Amino acid sequence: MATTASLFSLPPLRLGHRRLLPQTSGSDSRFQTLAAKKAAASTDAGPGGSGLLSVLDRKLTDEEEYRRARAQVQRKGVEAEGYGVEGISVGGHETCVTVPSLNVAFDIGRGPLFAVRQDNLFITHAHLDHIGGLPMYIATRGLYNLKPPTVFVPPCIKDDVEEMLQIHRRMSRIDLEVELVALDLGETYEIRNDLVARPFQTHHTVPSQGYVIYSVRRKLKKQYAHLKGSQIVKLKESGSEVTDTILYPEVAFTGDTTSDFILDPRNADALRAKVLITEATFLDDQVDVDHAREHGHMHLSEIMEHSQWFRNETIILTHFSNRYSLEDIRQAVNRLQPKLLSKIVALTEGFKSEYS
C-alpha cells in the first residue's frame, strides 16, 4: 500500500500482549522458536509427549492470530481505486476520514493530526463524535501557518457552528480563521477546476447529509466531432462553447445513516461512485435491525439485503460499534456474499485485537 505524505509523524503503536515463550536472541522470532520446539517435541517418545504437542499447537495458533491482528492494528489506511484513504471511525467515539489526493476530510471527531493538512472539511452532522474536533482542527492549521480551511456544513447548523467558534475565539483569544460554507442538497461547490462536491440526503437522528466528490471532465460536443482542430479553435475564439461538462462521482461519504439512503433515487451518484465510504455500526444478532434503525444507524445485514443497489467499485465500511474487536469485524465481514465481499474493505483503525 502506498503511503501518503503527512505533516505529522505519529508515535509508533505499542501493543501489549502475553508472551507465549521467552524471547530468543539473534534473528529468530518467537514464531520460529515455537515451530522448532514443536518439531523437537514430535521426536519425544516419552510419556506426556502428545500433551506437549497439544500445548504447542495452541500456542502456534495464538501466535498466528496475534500476527494477523497486529498487522490489522498497524494498518493506518487503505488503498481504494487509486485513492489513499486514511481515517478512524469508532461508533460514538470519533469519526474522521481523509482522502489526501483530493485534499478533503470528512467529519472531524476529536481533531486527529492526520486531518490537519486537508484544506476542505465536510461535516455530515452535529454529533460531537463527528464535529467535536472542529475548533482544534482550525486552530492547529493556524498554528502551522496553513491557510484558513473551507468547512462545509448542513445549512441548518451553520449559525450554531459559527456561534460555537465565536465562543472558542472569546475563550482562547485566537482568530480561528475559517471559511464556513452552508452547502444544501442540490447545490454544487467547486473545490478546484477539476473537482466539485455535492451533498446528498442521509437519515440519522439529527439533520444530516452525505457528500459526493466528482471529477470534472470536458468532452467535445457531438456536433463538432467531425471538425478539424483549426475549426474548433476558431469556434472557441468566437465564444462558442464546444465542450460538454461531465461529472464523474469519485468518492462518496455518508456519515451516520440508516439504510434508507440506499433506496432514495436521488442518491444514485453515491451508489455508483468509485469509492463509497459508509457505516455499518452493528454486525451481529446481538443487536437487531430495528435497534440500529431506531438509533439512526445501519446493520451489516442491511448492506447484504440491499447489495444489488451498490454499483461502487469499493465500499469502505466504518463506524463499527466499540463493542467489537478486530476479530469480530473480520469474521462478520467474511460472512458476506462473495460478490459483495470482493468490494468490501473494513476501516479498523482504533479497534483492539483480542490478542493485544
How does the language model describe each region?
Residues 145-149, 157-184, 323:
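Active-site neighborhood of divalent metal-dependent phosphoester bond hydrolases
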Residues 136-139, 163, 305:
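Short, well-ordered alpha-helices that flank and scaffold nucleotide-derived cofactor binding pockets
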